[in-house]
């Protein structure tokens, strides 16, 4: 938290709440424990805020004992918002904790992961509203202006972003999973890992579709994943219209420096060319060329 302040990061763009759960192998922390933990984080990041991603258990993440279920293909199975919606009491516990923790810290938000369509979003929002009403009845202070967003990491959600943009306050593109699901490549499988390319033309077009849908409804789109911290691809992301990058603390000074040295008009023009490129190599070359021109010192 303090390191974040030292490097000039503006809040926490993605707090993975499941990491907190991993430290509790015997079960999910209760509402009070979660509230204390989230509040400390929110207060430490004030006034910029924290985006709390709800439990993203499954896939490549080890869940606590309460959620441990063997699956033949965990990346396409019970994970993300699917887990939360199937365990409404655990979900409500976490939502109430986040609402309470952010009562006195404006600028915070909540984000639902692994969304695949409209029904999941409205169902999750309905449960969140129930939590607000429960806290209201008990006269427990809670965040009344908490922003609600979703991760765009499944192609079906990306295709529906024109509809989903009317239901949320922001998007966050999870480039790692979006790439994996778009081009059907398991990034941890050595036999096909070389095919895992976030700059695949289909991935870039899906990102453009998502950002454009957000712009039409005046909602921002953040970028998460390894792609957000790649200085060679930063011109492309800025050109597509991404409004913020969620990166590791150690990358914040570098990314801030790079962004300050980019010309948005040039990035926009380059991104339009990239959207017409036939392959990943052409897209990388276009973005890298502008990156080297804009901040040569970072390539020395």
Predicted regions and their residues:
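Conserved alpha/beta-domain cores
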Residues: 3-300
């Amino acid at each position: 938290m303090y390191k974040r302040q030292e490097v000039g990061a503006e809040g926490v763009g993605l707090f993975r709440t499941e990491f907190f759960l991993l430290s509790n192998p015997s079960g999910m922390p209760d509402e009070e424990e979660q509230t204390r933990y989230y509040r400390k984080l929110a207060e430490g990041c004030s006034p910029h805020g924290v985006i709390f991603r709800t439990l993203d258990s499954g896939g490549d993440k080890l869940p606590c004992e309460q959620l441990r279920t063997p699956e033949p293909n965990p990346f396409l199975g019970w994970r993300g918002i699917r887990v939360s919606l199937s365990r409404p009491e655990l979900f409500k516990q976490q939502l109430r904790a986040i609402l309470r923790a952010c009562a006195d810290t404006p600028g915070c938000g909540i984000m639902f992961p692994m969304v695949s369509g409209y029904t999941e979003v409205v169902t999750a929002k309905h449960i969140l509203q129930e939590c607000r009403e429960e806290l209201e009845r008990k006269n427990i202070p809670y965040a009344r202006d908490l922003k609600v967003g979703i991760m765009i990491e499944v192609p079906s959600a990306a295709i529906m972003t024109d509809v989903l943009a009317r239901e949320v306050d922001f998007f966050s593109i999870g480039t790692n999973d979006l790439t994996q699901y778009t081009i059907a490549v398991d990034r941890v499988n050595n036999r096909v890992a070389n095919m895992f390319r976030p700059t695949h033309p289909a991935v870039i077009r899906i990102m453009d579709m998502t950002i454009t849908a957000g712009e039409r409804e005046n909602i921002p789109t953040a970028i998460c994943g390894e792609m957000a911290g790649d200085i060679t691809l930063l011109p492309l992301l800025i050109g597509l219209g991404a409004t913020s990058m969620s990166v590791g603390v150690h990358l914040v000074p570098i990314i801030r420096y790079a962004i300050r040295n980019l010309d948005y008009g040039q990035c926009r023009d380059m991104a339009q060319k990239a959207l017409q490129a036939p392959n990943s190599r052409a897209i990388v070359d276009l973005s890298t060329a502008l990156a080297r021109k804009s901040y040569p010192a970072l390539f020395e």
